[in-house]
Amino acid sequence: MLTHRNLAENATCLDMNIPEKSVVLSVLPIHHAYCLCMDILKGFSLGSTICINDSLIHMAKNIKLFQPNIMLMVPLMIESLAKKLQAAKDLPAELVKENVFGAQFHTIFSGGAYLNPDYITLFERFGISILQGYGMTECSPVISTTMAGKQKKQSVGMLMPNCEAKTVDGELYVRGSSVMQGYYKMPEETKEALSDGWLKTGDLGYVDEEGYVYLTGRKKNLIITKNGENVSPEEIENKLGTSPLV
C-alpha cells in the first residue's frame, strides 16, 4: 500500500537538475511504479511535456516524432539501442546520435535490473548520459539514483534524501517517507517485510561512506558451497552477459 505522500515524496524530494519543460517520451507501462513516479509525477512537478509511446514497435518512429530530451528505460531496451550505436561506430558520433535519438536528446534514466557499466561508457561517446538507479515498488519506487557528473562505477547511485539504509547480515534494509505502509490485507507478509519501519529489500549490498549504494546479489539466490562459502550467481550471470555469444 502506497500513500499519496509516499509517491509525492519519492517524486519531488530530490532536485535532479532536470531542465523545466523538458520533453519526456514515456515508453514503460504507466501502471508500474517506476514509470508512474519518475515519468508522470516527476514530469508533472517539473512542467515537462510527457509523450506516451503507444507501442515498443513504434518507439523509433515516436522518438523522431516527439523529439524527447529524456527517456526512462530498462536495461534490455538500452542493450537493444546499444547494438545500433555499435553497428555505426565508424560513423561520426554526432551524426549517429541525431539519426537514432535526435540532436536534442541528452539523458536516459535506467532502472529495474543490472546494467553493464560498459553501456554507460558507450552512450557517453555519443553525448548521452545514462543515470542508473535502484528501487522497488515497496519504496515508491526509487531508493537511490545517479546524478549527472557524480557517477561511481558499479554503484547504483546515491541514497535519496528521504531514505536511509543499513546492512543486516549482508541484506540491505531501507527506511524513509517513501516506504510502503504494508501489503494490502496481508498482515503476515507485511510483518515479515517490515521491522520497526525498516523494509527488508531482499537485496545483498552496502552503502559507502559517501552514501553510494552497491548491490552484490539477491539473498534468496545465494548458493552455499560445501565449504560454507556464499556465492552470488548474479556476478556470474552479469559476467556472462558481456559475451556476444550469450
Regions from the language model: what does each represent?
Residues 50-53, 117-169, 178-181, 191, ...:
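Conserved ATP-binding loop and adjacent catalytic segment of the adenylate-forming AMP-binding
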Residues 20-21, 104-105, 196:
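Phosphate-coordination loops involved in phosphoryl transfer and adenosine-cofactor binding
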Residues 8-23, 30-95:
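Conserved AMP-binding/adenylation subdomain of ANL enzymes
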Residues 1:
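Conserved adenylation A10 loop of the ANL superfamily
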Residues 159-225, 230:
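Conserved ATP-binding/catalytic segment of the ANL
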